Every structure is written in structure tokens, then in C-alpha cells.
């Protein structure tokens, strides 16, 4: 019996969510580097063959480039720890990317507030 087309996509999402939860815990417990700051994992996307995972993160108290470099340097170690936790055939190679959307949202909100304040002053 052929699989439904949505079932593969659903499995991909479930595995990505599990990877995000496990990685968040592993990063907190295993990576003790004060230069990294407080890292929050925003999302995980997987390739259809589960070979690669893009992990999008934000950081507080550190430069995004520094945190990204540390995370990508520790990606192999995190991969090995993840392999012990996940019960799937292929654990993806991890690629960490800074998610600047939060900062862009804050900047847009600031600009809107500034424009509204200017408009109120003019009235």
C-alpha cells in the first residue's frame, strides 16, 4: 500500500521538532562556554533524506558570529550525542545559522513607534 504524501512531511516535522528539543537540552548541559551567551533554538529544517539539518538560533549576551562559530565547531560532538538519543537510521549533519528575524522585528517595531511619536507630535 503506498504511503500518503503528507505522512513523509509529517514525519520530517516530528523529527525536526525532536532534534530541536534534544539539541536545546544538550547545548545547555554540554557546552560550557561563556563567550556563547544564552542560545535559543528557533527552528530546525531537515533535508528530505535527513542528511542535513539547518538549526536556526538567536543569542542573548554574545555576538551571533561568535555563538555560531562555537556551535558549528561543536556540531560533530552534538551530532554524536544526538545519535545516542534518537532512534532513527540517519542522524543529520548539523549546520547552525543565526536567525536575525527577531532583531529585524524589534527594529521594525522601534521604527513604527518612532513614526507614531513623530506623527503625534505634529498633530
From Swiss-Prot:
One GO biological process term: maturation of SSU-rRNA
Entry-linked Gene3D superfamilies: 3.30.300.20
Cellular compartment(s): Cytoplasm
Molecular function via GO: ribosomal small subunit binding
One GO CC annotation: cytosol
Transmembrane segments: none
Main location group: cytoplasm
Alphabetical UniProt keywords: Cytoplasm, Ribosome biogenesis
InterPro entries per record: KH_dom-like_a/b, RbfA, RbfA_dom_sf
Superkingdom of this protein's organism: Bacteria
Function: One of several proteins that assist in the late maturation steps of the functional core of the 30S ribosomal subunit. Associates with free 30S ribosomal subunits (but not with 30S subunits that are part of 70S ribosomes or polysomes). Required for efficient processing of 16S rRNA. May interact with the 5'-terminal helix region of 16S rRNA.
Family: Belongs to the RbfA family.
Subunit structure: Monomer. Binds 30S ribosomal subunits, but not 50S ribosomal subunits or 70S ribosomes.
Record-given protein name: Ribosome-binding factor A
Organism, as annotated: Ralstonia pickettii (strain 12J)
Amino acid at each position: 500500500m503506498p504511503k500518503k504524501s503528507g505522512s513523509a512531511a509529517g514525519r520530517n516535522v516530528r523529527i525536526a521538532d525532536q532534534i530541536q528539543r534534544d539539541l536545546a537540552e544538550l547545548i545547555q548541559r554540554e557546552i560550557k562556554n561563556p563567550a556563547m551567551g544564552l542560545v535559543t533554538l528557533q527552528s530546525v529544517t531537515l533535508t528530505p533524506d535527513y542528511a542535513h539539518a539547518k538549526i536556526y538560533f538567536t543569542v542573548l549576551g554574545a555576538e551571533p558570529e561568535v555563538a555560531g562559530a562555537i556551535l558549528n565547531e561543536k556540531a560533530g560532538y552534538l551530532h554524536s550525542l544526538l545519535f545516542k538519543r534518537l532512534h532513527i537510521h540517519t542522524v543529520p549533519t548539523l549546520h547552525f545559522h543565526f536567525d536575525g528575524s527577531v532583531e529585524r522585528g524589534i527594529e521594525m517595531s522601534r521604527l513604527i513607534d518612532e513614526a507614531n511619536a513623530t506623527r503625534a507630535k505634529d498633530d
